[in-house]
Amino acid sequence: MTTASAPAPPWPRPRGLLLDAMGTLIGLRTSVGATYAAVAAEHGIDAAPAAIDRAFPGVLRQAPPLAFPGLDGDRLLEAERRWWGERIDAVLGTAAPTALHHALFDRFADPSLWRVYPDVPAVLRRWHGAGLRLAVVSNFDRRLQPLLEGLGLADLFDTVVVSSSAGAAKPSPRPFRIALESLALEASQVWHVGDSAEDGAGARAAGVRCLLVRRP
């Protein structure tokens, strides 16, 4: 895990670390396009993996936040599924059947589709063993907790904050503040590690120092 730049002057040693998930701790084993196309084919829809991979980043950038204030339980799950269904339709360029929406939602909940970056387990164990409080802060939904469990990482974290249930997504400071409250730490006692401009902006807005990593 390499950082974009070393802090100067040195920052005080943190008591806790907040970490982004996708692109920082974990990544997909195969492209989004390959998975979308394979599942779409099971539902009788032809889709080109390369075209999906080209469209997907732009669709996500233009999407409203994956955040649903005031919702929980089944209502939150329904909102998460609907949000992703709209993205699926936009990527495929057609109104896909609800069954395909649900199949893709469930497919990306499968830990076997994901990989932990090689440096992550040892680094997390070292931090955890040193007594640092650890939390995940991610622009994702409630599938993340079972994903981390399936990937063998969940026990290393004191809390997992996802935008869908936090009611706000990075670059909002709200997910960071929820994590800080859960860890019982002040912003000055914590660093955030992420990989995107949203990580940096959200952390700064919450008063948290941020390091950005660059993955190949």
Model-derived features: positions:
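Asp-based, Mg2+/Mn2+-dependent phosphohydrolase catalytic module
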Residues: 1-17, 27, 41, 50, ...
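N-terminal helical cap/lid subdomain that shapes the substrate entry/recognition surface
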Residues: 7-118
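Structured helix-beta-strand junction loops
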Residues: 111, 130-131
